[in-house]
Amino acid sequence: MPNQGPVSDWTECSSSAEPPAVARAEGGGGGSAGHSYYQNSKDRIKDGHKVNSPRAKLQELWKMPQTVHTPKSMTEPSFLKHPDLTLVEKHYLCSVAKIYNANYLRTLMKRHYMHVIQRSSQKPGVLTHHRGHLSSRYSQKQHYPCTTWRHQLEREDLGPPNTAAASAPEMIQHSLWRPVRNKEGLKTGYASKTRCKSLKIFRKPGRPFMQSVSANDSESYMNEEKKEEDLLNKCMQSMSIEEQGEHLMLT
């Protein structure tokens, strides 16, 4: 076959690991000498880039032995003194022992909780918010009829404690007095102030809940609620007694 010569030249050249351009030039398959020179220079640049690539450097490093520096404090345990362990294996065991060390885990947990406490101190805590929510729900259930003596009791409660019990009958008498209208049609009297506020609670507004919940705070809170309920019962009894007296006087 007339084409057998070039094919045999191609196989021989390909087995000798030469570039295809050189094989074509030698086998008479076409192509100029300048093209073959350009191809050879391009392959040389590519080979030079491969030699200087990080992968080639990594392969060279794998062939060379590398030293691992292990601290002296980590070489004291008995399990690291086995004669068959290499330095790399000892370093690996040191890292595992550090992870499972109780002191190391305790340090990490302490750091985490300190970070959480620092973040929670910048804004109201969960317990504070929960306590405020409960107090608001309790105050909604403690609504009483809006009367004048209740507001007077709140004003007197802020003052000395002895004056609250002494001034209770006067406040009850004022509460029975009906407000009248003046010439301008505006209401006067004690009840005019109560019209401005809708269903004000008898309970004093609690202290701002910015501290953590404790046993002393809960006890003082319950004691204040009990005192206010007792005062309310006394006022209700005195009011009923005066109403009965006025009813007897009218009859």
Swiss-Prot record:
Annotated spans, Disordered: 1-49
InterPro entries xref list: FAM216
Biased composition (Polar residues): 1-16
Annotated TM spans: none
Domain of life per record: Eukaryota
Family: Belongs to the FAM216 family.
Name under which the protein is recorded: Protein FAM216A
Species annotation: Bos taurus
Species classification: Eukaryota, Metazoa, Chordata, Craniata, Vertebrata
